[in-house]
Amino acid sequence: MVKRISIGVCLGLVSFCSAVYAGSEMNMQDGMWEITSQVKMQGMTIPPMTFSQCITKDNAVPQNNSPGQDDCKVSDMKTTGSTVSWSVVCGEQAGNMKGKGKITYHGDRFEGEMTSEHMGMAMVTEMSGRRTGPCP
């Protein structure tokens, strides 16, 4: 009896979560995206970097996989409508950086920013992206 109630509760939660998700569909097209980011720090602007990444609704946070960035962990990802927010923490390879980001998708493009602290310096990374085609 308890097992049947537990299964019923689980199925009810899955149905509820599916209905909530369907009602707040993200306006974003899965596929390969070209992402341009520019880091700004006090007294310094770093030239823009462009990279490509396969982005999906399930994995909607742009991640630059440059050398030294592979120990970064994204957490607290939240989606509200077409806006995705997240936190990121990087280990020693990336200089113990931590930050928070937010981007808003508009179908085949997005814009947003990430604020972070790296080695005691505050940084703002402005990001924009455009879908270039399907993922390989």
Regions found by a protein language model. Give the residues of each.
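Bacterial N-terminal signal peptides that target proteins for export
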Residues: 1-9
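Bacterial N-terminal signal peptides
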Residues: 8-18
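N-terminal helix-cap/turn-to-beta initiation motif at the start of protein domains
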Residues: 20-32, 78
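Tryptophan-anchored aromatic micro-motifs
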Residues: 28-42
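Short beta-strand segments that buttress and anchor functional surface loops
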Residues: 35-37, 85-92, 112-118
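Central antiparallel beta-sheet cores of small beta-barrel/beta-sandwich binding domains
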Residues: 47-100
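Short, surface-exposed coil-to-beta transition loops
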Residues: 48, 95-100, 111-113, 122-126
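Edge beta-strand at a domain terminus
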Residues: 118-136
